[in-house]
Amino acid sequence: MGNIFKPIPKADYQIVETVPQSLTAINSTNLSTYECFKRLIDLAKKEIYIATFCCNLSTNPEGTDILNRLIDVSSKVSVYILVDESSPHKDYEKIKSSHISYIKVDIGVLNNESVGNLLGNFWVVDKLHFYIGSASLMGNALTTIKNMGIYSENNSLAMDLYFRSLDYKIISKKKCLFFTRMATKYHFFKNHNGIFFSDSPEHMVGRKRTFDLDCVIHYIDAAKSTIDLAIVSLLPTKRTKDSIVYWPIIKDALIRAVLERGVKLRVLLGFWKKTDVISKASIKSLNELGVDHIDISTKVFRFPVNSKVDDINNSKMMIIDGRYAHVMTANLDGSHFNHHAFVSFNCMDQQFTKKIAEVFERDWISPYAKEIDMSQI
């Protein structure tokens, strides 16, 4: 009789980055986002699912090339692009004459306030290969916006992202939401060799999936020595159409870790000209707390002065004790966790966590990471 408890086949993971040419001091040997997307298209034999906020690839040669490749391959395999209901139709004129299924998803139908956006970014090819990360389906995500994600081939974990894609398709119909499966094979209590996905908002978690906020708080509360955090915003607020509510859950957990357990906290803020004023105030208050024996360091990642208004370090990650890594696509913001749809990558494999930590460390010591100047943020 065969062994019914077969070990899960181990899969390989690669870090994927967009490192803009303007960041000349950063030397990355990781797979580029542009090459990753081309590779996924080339691998496709049956179907491609892409979930992203918007499709705006035709802004530069690299983005146009990816769009043309998707259009070409759509005559041979099924291609689904799932975008947020509110996203602009930038590439739709080219897409509508192709075989691509272009689907608008209204996450707001899931709650009484009709609030919510599709913020996650992932690709699933043939239920075997995937990308998940901060790079959206925009031309500048391949060139001038600094992004980070994860790529894997021949990985059964891809099926879990496929399940998310099907859920978004059902939501797009705005009917029969009861049939949204919210399925997953792997989660916090049953991971795939140390890897699993977590989800937001909470009403898309179901019985088996893991709520992303629960993961974030669990990792912070478990921290014994270090927390390294690369973010675009840290907002202790939850916003609706008509109000703003104080939401200190994550910030309080960080402060407790530092004050009560002596954890060293480093925060790298992806700063740009559109940074939220409340996020600025939140980061400033953390920086002010780093006195005496309280080990808090905060830096802002700034592009060179001649950069464009939308140039930003959009890489989002959290590394705990060098043992756990959480790669995010959304911000640490109550509104994101409560209303918006996204999927995060969780890693308990120490070898791959080390590789993610090396990206944070490289960025932290780079000349673009500046100590916070209170007069400039």
Curated annotation (Swiss-Prot):
GO cellular component, as recorded: host cell endoplasmic reticulum membrane; membrane; viral envelope; virion membrane
Protein's UniProt name: Envelope protein F13 homolog
Superkingdom of the source species: Viruses
Membrane topology label: Lipid-anchor
Record key words, sorted: Host endoplasmic reticulum, Host membrane, Late protein, Lipoprotein, Membrane, Myristate, Viral envelope protein, Virion
Subcellular location: Virion membrane; Host endoplasmic reticulum membrane
Organism from which the protein derives: Fowlpox virus (strain NVSL)
PLD phosphodiesterase domain: residues covered: 309-336
Task of the protein: Envelope protein associated with the inner side of the enveloped virion (EV) membrane.
Pfam families in UniProt: PLDc, PLDc_3
